Amino acid sequence: MAKTLSKPASGALAPWLGISLIVILFDQLSKIAILKTFAYGAQHALTSFFNLVLVYNRGAAFGFLSTASGWQRWAFTALGVGATLVICFLLKRHGHQRLFSLSLALILGGALGNVIDRLVYGHVIDFLDFHLGGWHFPAFNLADSAITIGAVLLIYDELRRVRGAR
């Protein structure tokens, strides 16, 4: 009887892609609801520090490059697709590392949520507006939230891993 020397996969991709899909679903449904409810620039105060508002972001985080001539749409789309490929590779390779994989799944879902916006609308739909007094944090969306939470978890996981190695 011959033995196979194939190496088993170190992590299952499906559960992590499932989490990413849930992020994309909630992100896109929330944006559809805002687009159907609000006119561009309209805002609805929910608390003294939080509004729902419809704004378009043609750039990246905090409106970076939002006034560029249009090339940024395709550059940020390509960046999102490239990140998707790298993240899928990492998830396949490290799927057994739960916190690491969860953080990547959140980042992946958020990145693809914003890529979908860029491909469908030509810009990202932002609608969560936190403010205090006259100061407003730049509006963002659920995809951005997932990316941020994923990044924080990724840093936490790395710090935990490094401390454990000491």
Swiss-Prot record:
Domain of life, source organism: Bacteria
GO molecular function (one): aspartic-type endopeptidase activity
Family annotation (InterPro entries): Peptidase_A8 (IPR001872)
Transmembrane helix among keywords: yes
Residue stretches spanning the membrane: 9-29, 45-65, 71-91, 100-120, 135-155
Catalytic activity: Release of signal peptides from bacterial membrane prolipoproteins. Hydrolyzes -Xaa-Yaa-Zaa-|-(S,diacylglyceryl)Cys-, in which Xaa is hydrophobic (preferably Leu), and Yaa (Ala or Ser) and Zaa (Gly or Ala) have small, neutral side chains
Top class in the EC scheme: hydrolase
E.C. numbers: 3.4.23.36
Single GO BP term: proteolysis
A GO cellular component entry from the record: plasma membrane
Subcellular location(s) of the protein: Cell inner membrane
Pathway: Protein modification; lipoprotein biosynthesis (signal peptide cleavage)
List of catalytic residues: 126, 144
Keyword terms: Aspartyl protease, Cell inner membrane, Cell membrane, Hydrolase, Membrane, Protease, Transmembrane, Transmembrane helix
Chief site of localization: membrane
Topology relative to the membrane: Multi-pass membrane protein
Record family assignment: Belongs to the peptidase A8 family.
Purpose of the protein: This protein specifically catalyzes the removal of signal peptides from prolipoproteins.
Protein name: Lipoprotein signal peptidase
Species, as recorded: Burkholderia multivorans (strain ATCC 17616 / 249)
